[in-house]
C-alpha cells in the first residue's frame, strides 16, 4: 500500500535514506515554497505530484482507482513545536511505552501512527482508495474496528466532552441516524453543542478521512481557482459542504454520501505543541498503572520527564517537571528547572542556567557550524517583532532585546518572528555556549553579545526548516 507524505522541504530529499524506506512504497514531496495551500489544496498537490512521478502517462482518475493509498500531511510550519521544526514533527522520537512489548528504541510518531491507518485501509471497501490523516497525532483504537460502510466520504470521530470538542471540528448526526452526517461544525461553542445535544449526537473529528475517487476528484477540482492551485481547507471548506443539511451549499459536494464512525476504544494524542509533546507522551505512558504489566522498573524523579539518546550529568530531581531531553549532552554545569525541552546539543563543558519555560535547541549547519536556537516553551513564533504581543522566551521581543542592549531594528526580517534572522551560526561549541548563555540567562555577557553580532544571522526559523540537511540531525 503506497504512502504519500507531505514533508518539510529539507526532509524530502533524505527521508528514504533516514527511514530506510522503499521508494516504490513511499512518495514524498513538500508544498511549493512560499505557498499556502491548506489541507485541501495540499492534498491535491500531493496526489497530483505522485501521479506525475509514478504514472506520468496515466489519466489522474485512472491512476486514483488502481490502488489504495495513505496520505499523511506532515509539512506544517511547526511554529508551536519549534524543537522538531527542522526535522519534521512526524519523525519526533517517542519513548518506548513502559507497558508495551515489541517496541523499538528508534520509534517515532510515524512508526506509531501507521499501523492503525493500514488496518483501516485493509478493512475499507474497494471503492475507498484514499485515506487522509495528519502527521502530528497519535491515534489508538483499543477495540476491533467495525465494518466500514461504502460511502463517498467516511470519517472517524471520538465521543468527547463539549469542552474538548469546542477546539476541534465536530461531526453532528441526528439521534435517529447516528451513522449519517447531518452537518459539520468547526470549533463550535459549548453553548451551541449543548443545544444540539437535545436532538443530535456529535463526535470530535480526529482527522482520519477516507475518500472515494469521486470525492477526491471534487476536492482537487475545488482546490483550483482560475486554473491555479490555491488555498482550500479540507475541514472548514470541504467539510462544511457535507451532510444531509450542510452549512455550505455546493451542488456537487452536497451530493456526496457521508458516513461517520466512532473509533472503537479510540484515544487521541496531539503532538502539535511543546506542551503537548510532553503531556501526550505522559498520557500514553500512564495508560497502564498495573505494576505487573510495567516492564521498566526504574522510577523517575518526576513522571513528566523524558530523556532519550542523551548523556545527562546534571542531577534531575522531583522539582524538574515537564522536561524533555533528546539527542543532547547536558553536563553537570547546567542548571535546569521545569518546562524545558533540550534537543540537539553537542558534547560541551558549559555552565548554563536554563530558566523555567526556556528551551534549548541546537541545529547543525553546513559541515561544521552550529545554530544556537533557544526559544520559549509556549512560544508560537508568530507576529511582528515590534509588536508588544509578540513573545520570545516568555517576554516581548522588545523587552528581550532591551535587556541585552540591542534594538529590534538590528534583527532583519522583523515583519514576523518566524522569518526573523535571529539565530547565530557558530563555528565552535565554545562560541555556541557563550552565545547561548547570553541569549537565555546572562544578558550582560559581553562575549556572547559580540558573538551574536559578529556571526552570520541569515538563519531564521523558516530558513532552518527549508534548508538544513536532515541527515545531520539523526
Which positions does each model-derived feature cover?
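Single conserved hydrophobic/aromatic residue that forms the stacking wall/gate
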Residues: 463, 468-474
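A short glycine/serine-rich beta->alpha loop
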Residues: 29-37, 97-99
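Extended hydrophobic secondary-structure segments that form protein cores and membrane-embedded regions
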Residues: 4-5, 68-74, 129-136, 260-261
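Conserved core of the sugar-phosphate nucleotidyltransferase
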Residues: 64-66, 85-88, 92-223
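N-terminal, positively charged, Ser/Thr/Ala/Gly-biased leader segments
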Residues: 1-5, 18-26, 60
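Flexible loop/turn segments at secondary-structure boundaries
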Residues: 10-14, 77-81, 138-141, 162-164, ...
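N-terminal nucleotide-binding beta1-loop-alpha1 segment
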Residues: 1-16, 67-83
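Left-handed beta-helix
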Residues: 2-7, 34-59, 153-154, 159-163, ...
Amino acid at each position: 500500500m503506497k504512502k504519500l507524505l507531505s514533508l518539510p522541504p529539507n526532509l524530502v530529499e533524505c527521508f528514504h535514506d533516514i527511514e530506510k524506506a522503499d521508494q516504490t512504497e513511499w512518495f514524498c514531496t513538500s508544498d511549493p515554497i512560499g505557498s499556502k495551500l491548506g489541507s485541501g489544496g495540499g492534498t491535491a498537490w500531493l496526489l497530483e505530484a505522485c501521479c506525475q512521478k509514478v504514472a506520468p502517462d496515466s489519466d489522474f482518475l485512472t491512476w486514483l482507482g488502481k490502488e489504495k493509498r495513505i496520505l499523511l500531511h506532515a509539512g506544517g510550519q511547526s511554529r508551536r513545536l519549534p524543537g522538531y521544526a527542522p526535522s519534521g514533527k512526524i519523525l519526533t522520537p517517542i519513548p518506548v511505552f513502559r507497558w508495551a512489548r515489541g517496541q523499538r528504541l528508534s520509534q517515532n510518531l510515524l512508526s506509531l501512527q501507521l499501523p492503525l491507518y493500514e488496518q483501516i485501509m485493509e478493512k475499507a471497501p474497494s471503492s475507498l482508495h484514499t485515506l487522509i490523516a495528519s502527521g502530528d497525532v497519535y491515534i489508538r483504537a483499543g477495540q476491533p474496528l467495525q465494518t466500514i460502510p461504502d460511502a463517498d466520504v467516511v470519517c472517524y470521530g471520538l465521543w468527547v466532552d463539549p469542552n474538548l470538542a469546542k477546539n476541534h471540528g465536530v461531526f453532528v448526526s441526528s439521534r435517529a441516524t447516528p451513522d449519517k452526517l447531518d452537518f459539520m461544525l468547526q470549533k463550535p461553542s459549548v453553548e451551541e453543542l449543548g443545544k444540539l445535544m437535545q436532538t443530535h449526537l456529535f463526535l470530535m473529528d480526529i482527522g482520519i478521512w477516507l475518500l472515494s475517487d469521486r470525492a477526491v476528484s471534487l476536492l482537487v477540482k475545488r482546490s483550483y481557482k482560475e486554473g491555479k492551485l490555491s488555498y482550500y481547507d479540507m475541514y472548514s471548506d470541504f467539510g462544511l459542504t457535507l451532510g444531509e443539511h450542510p452549512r455550505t451549499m455546493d451542488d456537487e459536494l452536497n451530493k456526496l454520501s457521508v458516513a461517520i464512525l466512532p473509533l472503537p476504544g479510540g484515544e487521541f494524542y496531539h503532538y502539535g505543541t511543546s506542551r503537548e509533546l510532553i503531556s501526550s507522551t505522559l498520557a500514553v505512558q500512564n495508560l497502564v498503572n498495573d505494576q505487573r504489566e510495567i516492564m521498566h522498573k526504574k522510577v523517575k524523579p518526576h513522571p513528566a520527564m523524558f530523556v532519550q539518546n542523551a548523556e545527562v550529568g546534571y542531577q534531575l530531581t522531583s522539582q524538574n517537571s515537564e522536561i524533555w531531553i533528546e539527542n543532547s549532552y547536558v553536563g553537570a554545569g547546567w542548571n535546569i528547572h521545569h518546562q524545558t525541552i533540550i534537543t540537539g546539543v553537542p558534547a560541551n563543558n558549559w555552565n548554563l542556567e536554563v530558566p523555567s519555560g526556556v528551551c534549548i535547541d541546537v541545529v547543525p549547519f553546513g559541515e561544521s557550524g552550529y545554530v544556537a536556537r533557544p526559544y520559549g516553551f509556549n512560544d508560537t513564533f508568530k507576529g511582528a517583532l515590534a509588536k508588544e504581543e509578540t513573545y520570545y522566551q516568555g517576554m516581548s521581543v522588545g523587552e528581550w532585546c532591551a535587556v541585552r542592549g540591542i534594538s529590534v531594528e538590528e534583527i532583519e526580517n522583523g515583519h514576523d518572528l518566524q522569518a526573523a534572522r535571529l539565530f547565530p551560526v557558530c563555528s565552535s561549541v565554545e562560541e555556541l555556549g557563550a552565545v547561548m548563555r547570553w541569549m537565555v540567562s546572562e544578558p550582560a555577557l559581553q562575549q556572547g553579545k559580540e558573538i551574536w553580532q559578529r556571526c552570520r544571522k541569515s538563519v531564521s526559523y523558516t530558513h532552518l526548516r527549508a534548508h538544513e540537511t536532515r541527515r545531520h540531525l539523526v
